[in-house]
Amino acid sequence: MLMNRFVLKRVRQGKPLNKPRLSIFCSHKHIYAQIIDDMVGRTLVSASTYHYKQGWHSTMKDAQEVGQKLAQQALEKGIQQVVLDRGSYRYHGKIRALAEAARKEGLKI
C-alpha cells in the first residue's frame, strides 16, 4: 500500500485513519475547501468561492458560505465526521468561520 505524507503523519501521531480530512486553502482572491480520503487518495467533496462567485471573494462571510455548502454536500454523500487540516494557517478568521459554519450545518469536526 502506498502511503502519502498525510497518512504517515497521522500514523506517527497516533491519530485515527478512518476519518477523511477537511483541507482548507486561502488565496488572496478565493477560499477553497475539500474533503479528502487519504487511504484511497481521492477528493470526496469540494467547495470554493471560485465556483460560486466572480472577482475577489476571500472574506469571512464567503468562508461561512463555503463551509455551509461543503457540509451540505458532505452530509448528502454520507460523510458525517472529518478531521480539520488547516495547514499552516492559524485557527482564526476565515479558517474559524469556515469550520464553525460546517459544524452548524451538522458536520462533526
Curated annotation (Swiss-Prot):
Task: Give one Pfam hit by family name.
Answer: Ribosomal_L18p
Q: Which GO terms describe its cellular component?
A: chloroplast; ribonucleoprotein complex; ribosome
Where is this chain's protein located in or outside the cell? Plastid, Chloroplast
InterPro entries this protein is in? Ribosomal_uL18_bac-type (IPR004389), Ribosomal_uL18_bac/euk (IPR005484)
Keyword entries, A-Z: Chloroplast, Plastid, Ribonucleoprotein, Ribosomal protein, RNA-binding, rRNA-binding
Q: Which SUPFAM superfamilies match?
A: Translational machinery components (SSF53137)
GO MF entries: 5S rRNA binding; structural constituent of ribosome
Q: A Gene Ontology biological process annotation?
A: translation
Question: Which protein family is named in the record?
Answer: Belongs to the universal ribosomal protein uL18 family.
- Assembly information from the UniProt record: Part of the 50S ribosomal subunit; contacts the 5S rRNA.
Q: What HAMAP family does its record include?
A: Ribosomal_uL18_B
Protein name (database record):
Large ribosomal subunit protein uL18c
Q: Which organism is it from?
A: Cyanidioschyzon merolae (strain NIES-3377 / 10D) (Unicellular red alga)
Instruction: List the taxonomic lineage.
Output: Eukaryota, Rhodophyta, Bangiophyceae, Cyanidiales, Cyanidiaceae
* Gene behind the chain: rpl18
